[in-house]
Structures are given as C-alpha cells and as structure tokens.
Amino acid sequence: EKICFEYLKNCNFEKKLENFYKKKTILITGGAGAIGSNLAISLSKLVGKRGKIIVLDNLSAIRDEEPWNLPSLENMIFVKGDIRNDEDLKRVFKERPEIIFHLAAFFANQNSVDYPENSASVDVMGQIKLLEYAALTNVERFVYASSGCAIYGSYPKLPLVEDFISMHLTTPYQINKMTGEMYCNFYNHHYGLKTVNCRFFNSYGPGEVSGQYRNVIPNFLFWSR
C-alpha cells in the first residue's frame, strides 16, 4: 500500500487526472446513488467550471426518508429519467457527453431473483440502448460498473485469477452483469467504442443505506447499532 501511494505521488497522478478531465462533459447514470454521487462530486472538481457533470437517475432505489446525496453545483445537471427511455436519453445526449460512467442498475442479487424481468430490462436492455447512443455520438470512453460476484461466480476457485470467468452464476443479477461486460466488449470490437469494465466487490462508503436489497456491509453496520 505504501509503495502504491509513493508511486502515485511521484508520477503526479492527481495532476494527470485533473488534466485528463478538465473541461470534459461527463454523464453518470445512476448518479444519485452512493457510488454515483461520490463520483459526481469528485469529478465536478476535476472538470472545473468549464466542464459539466450530467447525472441521470430515475430515483427508483431512493426512499423518501433517505438523505439526498447530490449537492447543488454550478457545473452539475440532474435529470430524472430512465436509461430505457429514448426521450430521456436524447435529453442528456444533447449535452454531448464525452465520457460515460454507467452505474445505473436494478440492484442487486436478491432483487433480481424476486423480479428477474425487471432486472433484465434495466441491466441488459437499458445498457444496450445506452451503448448504442454512446457509439452513435462518438463518446470517447464508456466505463461500466460490473460486479466481481458476476464474473467470478458464487463459488470461485481461490486464489482468484483476473481472467477467470465462472459459469456458476446463481442470480439474474450475476447473469446480467456478465452479459453487460460482453456487450461492452462487442461495442468495443464492432464500433470502436472504448469501454472499461470495473468489477466492484461489496462496495461501501458515504451515502450507503441499509435495507433488504442493499449491500451487506451497510446492513452489518446498521444491525450493530
């Protein structure tokens, strides 16, 4: 860990990040959630006053009693909408996003077991529609929020190897997330759209809430009170 931080410090990583994102227009789907809102706040600082952050979220996973994670910022636009809806996508793509962070999802495993059709509708068909818009408008980069449990399965062999792919998938969420990675690869090879697949493992942090369909660590913290 110490070596890693020293490397980042010596190579001016923060400055390179700032130079890369400066003045960019960035679309974040699912940007009102815990990960998305923290990402939006961080990127809003990097893009600067001449850049723009567009947050697209249908707020389906937010309960009335939960705090609103997104601040009101001069360079941030919030659009309440659905990635499956053409009118909503046309609205955000009018802003000409250069980079997309696709975090919107029908979250997560148990929810997908209870409602498999809704899960496939959002996590597969919604993503295909978003990828299509990204390819047609020459988006520079499409970053997809995948899942470690989806790719490595419920019972992976240890130690894990990064290029290992499991067929032991036990929930529609796992199946859909793996499918999402494959569609990213397809749009990369077929259309030249630059895509990045990020595999999250039980993420937690500011803005996370507990609940039946939420991540395990926030639930542990809630139950321990």
Segments from the language model and where they lie:
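Alpha-helical substrate-binding/gating segment
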Residues: 189, 203, 218-225
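Glycine/proline-rich active-site loop of Rossmann-fold NAD(P)-dependent oxidoreductases
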Residues: 178, 203-218
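Residue-level signature of the cytosolic catalytic core of signaling kinases
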Residues: 93, 168, 209-213, 225
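N-terminal Rossmann-like NAD(P)+-binding domain of SDR-like oxidoreductases, especially those catalyzing
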Residues: 1-203
